[in-house]
């Protein structure tokens, strides 16, 4: 599913946006072998404690309170704004005048964290000192204009690309520094839904969804069937189990990809423009499905007392999806976060760029240039 690491070695051979499928029939997220290792050029910018944070069932609420755990260094709480960073090389303060870099508190540790990440492809600088977090247990969104590196962020999370400088942490562990075996295991934490569902054309729907279980577990066929049918039921495709991908509508393929992304019970689910190609009604229905499954996974995490809460990250251009679905919003522009925070804070932001983008208005700092 991931393709190879040629883009990291070859620079401008990799597109800045779009799914890293590589073939017409990509494998599921955890199916590809780890690429050749390469450490990030820059050292990690900050130390991270590894204490366990409090789970919701330990605090009596749905969210662990800020500062209530040993991992408080990873909890997103803003006491005061840090000094404004200098613009990247070759850019001016005017280029980043709308970037306040303000991060409103989420009260949760970050499941994924980008620390001063720089990434270029040839002469094209995509990430330019990116600092961004995905709070654990929330549905986060990365939104922003086209070509700002949103899909590049996904590839960094799973170790398909490595920073030229900076670090990427998953549950406090540095992805660029992981040995091959650890990287391969880390990828199993992730489920990934591409724009088109990324199904194998030669397999029916049932076998597509069952593939990760058969490939990466020793479960019996009876166990596989129980899991697959449960996931197909969640996305409303129980009656389509024998259909081939070319017999499915675009929306059905996305839901099938969603079911397959869930079968290994990932801690982190990544959605790369899941609403692409869908009409407004089906986009709204998909958003409701994302929220429903996230709620179900949160309840399951409480019952099982899992170490980590389920974290969803949705990349989208659709403002309505962001308004309906997001718990937390990161607004990315020019390779850096303009502002980030819980959706209520972001939807009420006084930043002219944030207001323009989240209101889908023509008047504002963002132009056709």
Describe the function of each predicted region.
Residues 158:
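Helix-to-loop junction immediately C-terminal to a conserved catalytic motif
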Residues 244-248, 252:
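Conserved ABC ATPase signature
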Residues 173-174, 221-239, 291:
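Conserved ABC ATPase "signature" region
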Residues 265:
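Conserved catalytic motifs of ABC-family nucleotide-binding domains
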Residues 269-272:
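Catalytic Walker B motif of ABC-type/P-loop ATPase nucleotide-binding domains
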Residues 175-191, 221, 346-349:
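ABC ATPase NBD coupling module
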